[in-house]
Amino acid sequence: MIEIQDLVVRYGSATALHGVSLRVHPQEMVALIGANGAGKSTLVNAISGILPAVQGRVRLGGVLAHVPEGRQLFGGLTVEDNLQLGAWRFPSRRRDMQWVFDLLPELERIRRLRADQLSGGQQQMIAVGRALMSRPQVLAIDELSLGLAPKVVATLAQALRDLNAREGTAVLLIEQNARLALSLCTRAYVLEAGKVVKEAAAQELLHSEFVEDAYLGRSPEELV
């Protein structure tokens, strides 16, 4: 569970988030969509404690894991070693990676390869798998699909569905790819210029003129 109330984040004198409130219920998948510069990454970094807030409150129910934009792997380490780093707070879980392999079988096949030898899609799978090693109650993912082929995006999307169904893990999906995010999630928020301008059921937003005009103008092939 995530509960955010009236969150304000500033970079120097510039305000990046203006009193944002948002909630992710246990076992829920929620999308946060918006254009570049809307404040999506700032929000997830504030939720995970990377950025300080000058006002407001963030309340978490259980362990939060964060998949940052850009993957941030250790290229010289193997897939297995990168995964184990995800359980650094929970040493007893470092060898418990079979359940991650069950969600993302490709990781088991490449487990002994170095991360810098792999494709962008495989590296994104590692980043997601590493976050899951802590067995989180809440998973926040920043730009899951960025720069990835449709087949890889489909694999990762199915893994999130399976994770939510099997483990009951709540997911906050921060995405520019609105069609993907709204198709995966049950509820969604739209962020513009650091403010939540709309909250609704994901399917309602998917078929609304508001989102269609602003975020769904590209073809399904471009948006996956």
Feature locations, PLM:
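The feature captures the beta-strand-to-loop junction immediately N-terminal to the Walker
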Residues: 33-35
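Conserved ABC ATPase signature
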Residues: 114-118, 122
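Helical segment within the ABC ATPase nucleotide-binding domain
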Residues: 154-168
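Helix-to-loop junction immediately C-terminal to a conserved catalytic motif
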Residues: 48
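ABC ATPase C-loop
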Residues: 131-132
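Conserved ABC transporter NBD signature motif
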Residues: 55-64, 95
